[in-house]
């Protein structure tokens, strides 16, 4: 918590000083008020002197007006500081999240990151605001009230000596049991957010499979688990106020009884008894508020630790790394070579014994993948579900780092590239075409915000999207709903491909990006990418369709994370058992088997 305050509180340093300082002045007024009231009772009311009552009343009114002005200053400082620090924290968190690697994002989880950015920052904001407004006020008011009461009459001050330890014991007991539960509450809240996110994100799938009841059951289970822990914490916290007020009221009763005896004996005045009761009430109420502050700060401390966990997580890829000079990179001896790769000294892609395992997985997603791809060539990647196609693409794009082996891009290790240069050189179109709320123009300009209209229309023409965009009333300025829900699946895919082409990337990676296109549009798109895109454009096309990859210069066949075939369509159809099975399942004609050696043996 203190580290976050040091990190984000510097721009608001003077407000962090002025706010609590004004509260100290307010505490002085609060401590003087019972004394003024006591003088009013003893000198004015008891003596029946209205002028004295009016004089002290004006003093109290002046103190009240001054207190209001002081409170306004403090509230202003607290609001600006808390909101400003919260905004800065969210901005820094979001910036850091966008720099994390995909593996780090997987470890945190989307739901957890959302909760940290929204809920945890809110908890810290609340703690900062209360720290400015209350952290100085209540402890000083409690101590000041105790001192003032002892000064009035030390014998009655012994009542404080009994009441304060009782309140402290209740406070310590409740905190000891509730503090460990706060982190559990946050973890349960993460689970609720995850279930809600999955249910809303997959609403169409849920309805298609009539799984509404199951999803409701999942949400109820997660909500109940959160509610049980939150209720337990709430019950413990709820004990504080009643227990404290019980002790306080018993103390007031003791003061009134003892004060009456002392007044009869002439040891105290009526005004002093009233002042003593006020100080007793202020002191014990201050302890109640301090207890509530501790609850808030404990929650905020847990939230601050979760925020710091993200902020202190160094990205696995160094964004400020210097890309080394262009140099030829030799592939591993014996690695499979795409035809034509040896003709170029610096291939566009070079994988050497690459393996990868997802965190928590028992088996590797990819094992010992090696090949080279010349610049300007097209590589098709095909395989069954779960064979590792998308994982291979993400490794080649630098989105994940291999567990072992090396990935070189245009002659340089992927992890040595500057992050911005890498993203300019490589464009990835993921399986799920994601469009953002705005316009078609704003979505297309993600890679190049200054791209002229000619470049945008050129990308749309290549992606076979220009025709339907021109038909829209506003053309490039046509609105796009969140997620692109006002476009069909095929239109979203074509717009996503057009967005990737803007900025002239050197390497285009398509992850099953033809799946929503009809055969004619797919063929036209492949033709345009092969001949109409800026040259030289290297392509990696991941697909489950043979038609999408059969014209590629080379096709990589994956099976259970292993490279079991590499070659042209005709070569694989004649030699690779897995590829032949895929072709047969899609009713693609294949030539007679020329070799009985399966591609699994080739890879081994």
For each of these PLM feature ranges, what is it?
Residues 1-33, 37, 45-60, 74-78, ...:
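Membrane-integrated ABC transporters
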Residues 10-13, 99-103, 119-128, 132, ...:
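An intracellular "coupling" helix at the cytosolic face of ABC transporter transmembrane type-1 domains
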Residues 11, 15-28, 130-185, 257-268:
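Transmembrane helices of ABC transporter permease
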Residues 49-52, 148-162, 232-314:
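Helix-loop-helix
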Residues 97, 219, 307, 351-353:
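Conserved catalytic Walker-motif region of ABC-type ATPase nucleotide-binding domains
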């Amino acid at each position: 918590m203190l580290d976050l305050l040091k990190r984000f509180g510097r721009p608001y340093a003077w407000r962090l000083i002025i706010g609590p300082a004004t509260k100290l002045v307010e505490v002085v007024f609060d401590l003087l008020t019972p004394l003024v009231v006591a003088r009013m009772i003893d000198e004015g009311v008891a003596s029946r002197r209205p002028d004295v009552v009016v004089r002290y009343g004006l003093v109290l009114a002046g103190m009240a007006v001054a207190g209001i002005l002081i409170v306004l200053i403090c509230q202003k400082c607290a609001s600006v500081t808390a909101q400003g620090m919260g905004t800065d924290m969210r901005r820094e968190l979001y910036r850091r999240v966008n720099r994390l690697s995909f593996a780090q994002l997987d470890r945190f989880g989307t739901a957890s990151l959302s909760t940290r950015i929204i809920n945890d920052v809110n908890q810290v904001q609340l703690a900062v605001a209360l720290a400015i407004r209350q952290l100085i006020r209540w402890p000083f008011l409690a101590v000041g009230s105790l001192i003032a009461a002892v000064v009035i009459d030390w014998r009655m001050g012994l009542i404080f000596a009994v009441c304060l330890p009782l309140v402290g014991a209740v406070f310590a007991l409740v905190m000891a049991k509730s503090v460990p539960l706060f982190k559990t509450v946050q973890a349960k809240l993460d689970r609720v957010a995850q279930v809600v996110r999955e249910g809303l994100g997959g609403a169409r799938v849920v309805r298609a499979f009539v799984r509404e009841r199951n999803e409701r059951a999942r949400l109820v289970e997660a909500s109940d688990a959160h509610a049980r822990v939150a209720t337990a914490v709430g019950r413990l916290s709820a004990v504080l106020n009643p227990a404290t007020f019980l002790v306080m009221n018993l103390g007031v009763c003791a003061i009134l009884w003892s004060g009456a005896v002392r007044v009869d004996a002439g040891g105290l005045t009526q005004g002093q008894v009233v002042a003593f009761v006020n100080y007793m009430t202020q002191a014990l109420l201050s302890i109640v508020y301090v207890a509530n502050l501790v609850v808030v700060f404990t929650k905020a401390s847990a939230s601050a630790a979760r925020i710091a966990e993200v902020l202190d997580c160094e990205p696995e890829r160094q964004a400020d790394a210097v890309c080394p000079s262009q140099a030829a990179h030799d592939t591993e001896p014996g690695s499979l070579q795409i035809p034509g790769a040896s003709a170029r000294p610096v291939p566009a892609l070079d994988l050497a014994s690459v393996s990868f395992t997802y965190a928590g997985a028992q088996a590797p997603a990819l094992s010992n993948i090696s090949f080279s791809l010349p610049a300007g060539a097209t590589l098709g990647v095909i395989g069954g579900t779960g064979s590792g196609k998308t994982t291979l693409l993400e490794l080649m794009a630098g989105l994940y780092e291999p567990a072992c082996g090396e990935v070189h891009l245009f002659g340089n290790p992927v992890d040595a590239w500057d992050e911005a240069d890498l993203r300019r050189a490589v464009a990835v179109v993921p399986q799920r075409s994601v469009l953002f709320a705005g316009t078609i123009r704003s979505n297309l300009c993600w890679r190049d915000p200054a791209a002229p209209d000619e470049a945008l229309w050129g990308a749309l023409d290549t992606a076979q999207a220009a025709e339907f965009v021109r038909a829209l009333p506003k053309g490039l300025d046509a609105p796009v709903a969140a997620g692109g829900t006002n476009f069909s699946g095929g239109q979203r895919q074509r717009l996503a491909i057009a967005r990737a082409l803007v900025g002239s990337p050197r390497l285009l990676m398509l992850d099953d990006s033809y799946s929503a296109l009809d055969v004619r549009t797919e063929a036209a798109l492949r033709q345009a990418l092969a001949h109409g895109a800026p040259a030289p454009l290297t392509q990696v096309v991941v697909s489950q369709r043979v038609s999408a990859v059969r014209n590629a210069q080379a096709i990589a066949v994956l099976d259970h994370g292993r490279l079991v075939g590499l070659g042209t369509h005709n070569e694989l159809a004649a030699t690779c058992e897995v590829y032949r099975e895929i072709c047969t399942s899609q009713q693609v004609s294949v030539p007679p088997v020329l070799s009985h050696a399966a591609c699994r043996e080739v890879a081994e």
